[in-house]
Structure formats: C-alpha cells, structure tokens
Amino acid sequence: MNKICSLLILILLNSQLLNAQIINGKITDLNTKESLIGVNIISEEGSGTASDIDGEYQLKLTEGNQKITFKYIGYEEITKTFNIAKNEILNLNIALSSTSEELNTIVVSAGRFEQKIEEITVSMEVIKPSLIENKNTTDIQTVMDQIPGVNITDGQANIRGGSGWSFGAGTRVLVLVDDMPLISGDAGQVQWKLIATENINQVEVIKGASSALYGSSALNGVINIRTAFPSQNDIDKNKFPGYTKINTHFGLIDKPKREELNWNGDKRRAFKGIEFLHAMKISSLDLSLGGNIFLDDGFRQGEVTDRKRFNINSTYKSKKINGLSYGLNANFLFQTTGSAIIWDSYDRAYIPLNNEITTTAGDTYNIDPFIIYMSGNNRHSLRTRYLKVINDNSTKGRDNEQDNKSEIYYTDYQWQKNIEKYNIRITSGTTNEIVYAKANLFNGKNTRTNNSIYTQIDKKIGKFNLSFGARYEQFTIKSDKKYVINGDSINKFSAGKPVFRTGVNYQAAEATFVRSSWGQGFRFPSMAELFISANQGGLEIYPNPDLKPEKGWSAELGIKQGIKYGKWVGFIDIAGFLMQYDDMMEFTFNQWGDPSTAPLLGLGFKAVNSGNTQINGLEISINGQGKINKNLSLNILAGYTYMDHFSLDPDKIYAYAGDNQGVSYTNSSSDPTVLKYRYKHIAKFDTEITYKKLSFAASYRYNDFMSNIDYIFTTPLVNEGIPGIFEGIPGINESRENAKDGDYVIDTRLGWQMNDAFRFGFVVNNILNREYMTRPATMMSPRTFAVQCNIKI
C-alpha cells in the first residue's frame, strides 16, 4: 500500500512538472567561481525564489515572454529577457560581478540575514580579518578594544558606557560566534580564549539594546564573530588539496619606565605562539581545521599563560536533497593561567596583593551540530551547542576549594521567509538553554533554564527600510542551598519579560542614509552575581541572592554618509544615543562583611542593584578602505565617543554595608555626578598605509579620567591601612592623581608582503611605554616588541 501511495505522489508531481514551464540553473561569483547562496530570483509576473546552498535555483513560469531579475547584496543586479515555450525546461546559469567600487560591507547580525551595512537601522562597526592578523592578535579582546565606543575591562565588554567594572561576572554585551552565544553558564563570562582568531571572516558589533533578537545578555549590544568558509579562489591557486595558513610570532616585554615597577631585573619576559588553519573542499564537504599554541611569561608576577586551542568547522551539502546542509563546528581549549585582581602597591603594581595569584588549570570546549534547509524563499535552521567549562583553581600552589564546572545545552530553531513580492522578510524562532553548574564558590549545585520565542519583521518601502522585533524570555535558577529573603526560605529564582524593538532607515541621497531605532533590554543575574562567596587575588567577594534582574531601553538617531576618492571608499557615521537602565546591577567595593570577623576588615565586592541610571551621548566614526592610486592604499577605522552618564536617584539607599550603614550612589561614589568605572570621552583610530609591498600602521586609544570609583577605594582605610591589622592597598589615590589628564596608548606596526605566500611584520605595542590603567589598582602592560611571519600556501 505504501509503495502504491508513493508511486501516485511521484506521478502527480511529475505531471505537474510536465505541465509547467521551468527555468533553472546555477549562480556563481564571476571572479571566484564560488556558488552564491540566497540570490533572489524574481519574475516580472511576481513569482520568485532564492538559490540554495549550492547556488542552484528552480522557478516555475507561465509560457511566453518573461523578464527575470537576479539580485544579491554586494553584486550587480542582472535582468534577463527570454521566451519560454509550453512545458519547456530552460537552463540558465548566471555569473554575478561584485560592486567593487562600493564599500560592500555585508552584515548579518542586525537582522539575522544579509544586509548592506548602510541600510540597517542600528549603529554597527565591522572589523576585517586583516586588522586581526596584522596586529599580531593572540586574544581577540585586543582588537575589540580598538573599536570606536568599545572598551574591554577584565574580559567584559562595555559599549558606549553601558557597563562599568563587573568583576568578570555577568555581561551586558552578548558575544556570539556564528550567531551562537559564547558565555559560560555559571559566571556569565565571555570565553574569549576559545575564539579561533585564525579563522575569522569579520567581526560585527551592534551598539545598543538587542535583546529582542538575541536575548538577555544583549542589553548593551552584540559582538558577533563570523567564521570563514573555505575559499574556492584560494583553493584554485594551489596544487595541493585546499590551502594552509601558518602565523608565528615571538615577542619581548620591555622594562617599565619606573625602576620601582621592574620586579624582574634585567631579564626580559617573553611570549611566543603559532596558529594554523587548513581549509579545503572535498566534493560536497567544506572543512576547516585550525589551532593555536601560545606561551606567555606575563608582565605581572605569576601571570604565566600556557594555552593550546584546536578547532574544526565542517559543512556537508546534501546531494540527495536540494537545499539541505548540515555539519559540526567545535573548539577545544586547554590552558593554565595566572590572574591577579589588585596590585600590592603603586610602586609594586606588577606584583599582586599579598603575592596571591590565582592559578587556573582549565579545559573549555564547545561542540555545535547544526542543520539548515533552504527551499525557495524559506530557510529553516536548527543550531545546537554543548559548552563545557572546567576550572581547577589554586592559590600559591594549594587548592583553594574554588573550582567550578558548568555545562550548557543550547538549542535555537529559526525560520525565515522572504516574500519578495512585498519586500518583506520574516524571522521567527525559539531558543532553549539549560545550564548545570557545580562549584563550592557558588554554594554547590545550581541549575538554570532559559526559554524564549522571538520574531522580527523587516520591510522595504521605496527608500525606507523598516524593522520591528519582539521577544519573550523566561529564566529560572534553582539552587541546592536555600536562602532567606524577606522572611521566606527559597531556592528557586524566576523572572520573565517581553521586550520589543523598532527601527527605520531612509536613503536620503545616493550615499546618505538616515536611521533611527529604539529597543528594550533585559538581563537576568548570573549564578556568580547571585551566589558567589570566594576569595580571589586576596579580596573577598560576597553573595547577593536578593539581586533583581535589570532592564532598560536604548534609542538613537544617526546618519551614515558614503565617501569616495577614486577607488577608496568609506563611510562617516554620526549618531546620538540615549540609554536608561532600571535596577542596574553593578559589582561594588565596600565593607560588606563583618569588620570584626571577616578578612580585610570585611572589605570586598558584591553585586547590587544600584538604582536607575541614564547614559546619553554622541559618537562620530569613520571606516574606509581602498586604493588612493596604483601603488598606495589606505585603511582607516577611527571614532570619538562622548558619554554623559549619571544616576537618576543618587540619594536612594539601595544596600546596607558595615555596621548596617545605608549605601547610596552619593555616599558610595568618589564623584556621584557620574556613573562608576566609566569615561566621558573616548577616542580611537587605526590607520594602515600600504605602498606596493610595504605597510605602516599606527593605532591610538585615548580615554579621559575615570572620575568616579567606589569611594572606599579613596579612603585612608584602603590607601594606608591600619598598622598591625590591615596593610591597605597603597597608591590608589596617587595613581589617580597622576592620571587626571586621562590616558593614551600608541601602537605601531610594519609589514612586508614578500610574495603571495610570505608576509613579515614587526609590531610595537605601547610604543611610548606609558603607565596606564583600565580601573583602579591594576597597571597594564609596558611596551612590547614582536616579530611575526605569516605563511599562506
């Protein structure tokens, strides 16, 4: 019976095809010959489809004269006119040429589909892989800190002043790799070291609340690292299967300017590393294998790093089912690192407080199976992730009972529908995340679940691009331990909230685009912020199970102006922005413990809801690349950000410390007129000039004085201590006095492209050997020198 039914269905389908006119073919890049996925094929009569994962398409038509248009972002549009007879099957292969004299920056993060950057409704910066390679990047955070409006402090990203110092727990900026979150399940820490710097296509940074499309941690923005597919153009250049990249480097850390800071004598600390990538296509399989080995003696005493990382990216395109592809991506990290939080003193700034270094032997890995199916104008994707983080912590060679382990099971199903006739694209999906965590410092075993549904609609009307999105999220954390809150003994914490966003982009002139957007954000506290009880680097960290979720919104009005000089193209972007947060969560330094019994007189950190806040400001940036003339090319990324940030209720008591003393923003701040651990002015630029085979580049980063920190850091209790009881943390006030005019750092680099296979570089970071800090009581690296050799065969 089943065979008969199958035969009848087959006959019915064939009869429909026999009584229809069909055009089919394959669409490729004119220069690289690579298949183009998602090209829109639209007939004049209104029907349409899109090319599949192999670049192939098929479209039913009525008989007679037809006019078909092939449209793809970043490529010249092609229109074909022809006559198709009754029941004819016409094969038409198309080769599209790129619009080479446009900036041609295509992004996916703003709406989870490909768009030109000038047409999106939010502010976004894009980093290309050349900057990552040429800066001798051993950790992607280095490049993130070069982006206008972005700062990285202790591994936490801060966009336009949206975050202060979060002590490495929780994040308001969601970091993704190929649309998948890369944040630990317990502490909410970004797993920067797991990111394969050797296989990056581009980095996209959304500035502003993006929770509607990406979820809780996107309250302040999104950083999406997009990995590269094997390039057919590069493969065709080689006699061997695929192509291989090998980058090696060796560097030295210079002595600090002040002799008091030189804890290592005349011996120079060194760092060295190698990273490699092999990419190939085997029939219908795209495969990339990569890895990195990095050894760093460290510029601080005891902060030694031994890191090994390996990765695989694979995609198989089904030969049996058109439009079906599936694969597996994975990263494996094995490392031993030392970390310190606070210096011993201003004159011993590269020595940790009380010589206490936390050494972490950690294994981190993610395994990501996925499946994608494209049919006509529909796209279905199912992405899954297993992320495991294991940290074995010790202090001075002894187990400190602060080990932690977490596992994440993550699933995201997404459906996209492109209705070409009405210029509408619908993106909808559901996300599920389960976290299992075990750690003494988080009071045993904890479980977290996060379920959400989301949708976004994008519509093009003439020169307008409109966008609307919504999401609902529900969080639950369950702990083995019960906590007494408002007289109730509980071990379950839950919260849920809908969030919305909307935006519009208008093309006012040929190269002028005006945009406006508004979006809500929501963030549930991490397990670390709720439950942590630990001593790290000599400082106590206290739990706060009474912590509430934070929420907020952001809005902006911006204009993007295209500029062109010969074959050099770029954009100037100006944006005004406004953000408000309710119940903002911040780690705050105060006397949270009992002064008579707790270590360090009860001094330490705790996450608290510090009230309602506002941040508004202005940002100007420029991003461009291309040739000035036949032999000279110029790449530039630059920007200035002004931020005015303050508490909306500075006198409100939001916590109690010490002997039950009320804590408000006013009495806990060194400057209560602004928010803590933030700047008001940030300026950055990176410029690279290439003449024939030689290149020279300079990077500059400036921030003004961080006027507001936790007030207790500035008191005699902390700076001078109490003789015989507490030695204090000397030099915080002195260092701040010396930084009153702000800090700036200049990096330089030279490059020589010997031939297509070999490139050599010389990189000097902090060339002026300046003393600078990103927060109180932590001195950043003195000058470093590095030589690099990049091979591509």
PLM features: what roles do these ranges have?
Residues 384-385, 389-393, 515, 548-604, ...:
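Membrane-embedded beta-barrel scaffold of Gram-negative outer-membrane proteins
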